[in-house]
């Protein structure tokens, strides 16, 4: 007889009331600043120059994210953590829950590192 075990780790992020809320443009700017510090180290260590993660975000009736859950990783725990933390601080009017107290959407966060540039992208998926 063979017995197997499967375990799953769910990583989610909650907003911090002590930190500001961001729209998607401001969130991308914040991540760009972070990547400008991280990218030279990534490139020197021969780590991936680009990638993306996907998160499921839950918003309230104001469009503020109340929870961001990592569903697809970049493969880098530090980047995933930063993307999750910033996603949890989003507040976007077009993401307001209207029919119920909360709404759930998918968010794609990408990054690209080059010797002289670092870019983050955020896209709320339909």
Question: Could you say what each language-model-derived stretch is?
Answer:
Residues 49, 64-66, 79:
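Short loop/turn segments at connectors of secondary-structure elements within structured domains
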Residues 6-40, 60-72, 84-94, 101-126:
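Conserved "boundary/linchpin" sites in short secondary-structure elements
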Residues 48, 99-102:
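Short helix-terminating capping/connector loops at secondary-structure junctions
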Residues 72-78:
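A short acidic/small-residue loop/turn micro-motif
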Residues 2-4:
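C-terminal motif of bacterial Sec signal peptides marking the signal peptidase cleavage site
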Residues 42-44:
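Long, charged low-complexity terminal regions
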Residues 47-54:
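Short, small/polar residue-rich loop motifs at catalytic or cofactor-binding pockets
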């Amino acid at each position: 007889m063979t017995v197997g075990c499967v375990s799953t780790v769910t990583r989610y992020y909650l907003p911090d009331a002590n930190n500001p809320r961001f729209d998607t443009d401001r969130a991308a700017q914040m991540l760009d600043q972070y990547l400008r510090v991280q990218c030279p180290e990534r490139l020197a260590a021969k780590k991936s120059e680009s990638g993306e993660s996907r998160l499921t975000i839950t918003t309230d009736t104001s469009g503020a994210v109340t929870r961001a859950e990592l569903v697809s990783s970049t493969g880098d725990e530090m980047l995933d953590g930063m993307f999750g933390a910033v996603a949890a601080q989003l507040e976007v009017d077009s993401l307001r829950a209207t029919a119920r107290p909360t709404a759930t959407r998918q968010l794609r966060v990408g990054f690209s590192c080059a010797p002289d540039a670092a870019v983050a992208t955020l896209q709320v998926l339909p």
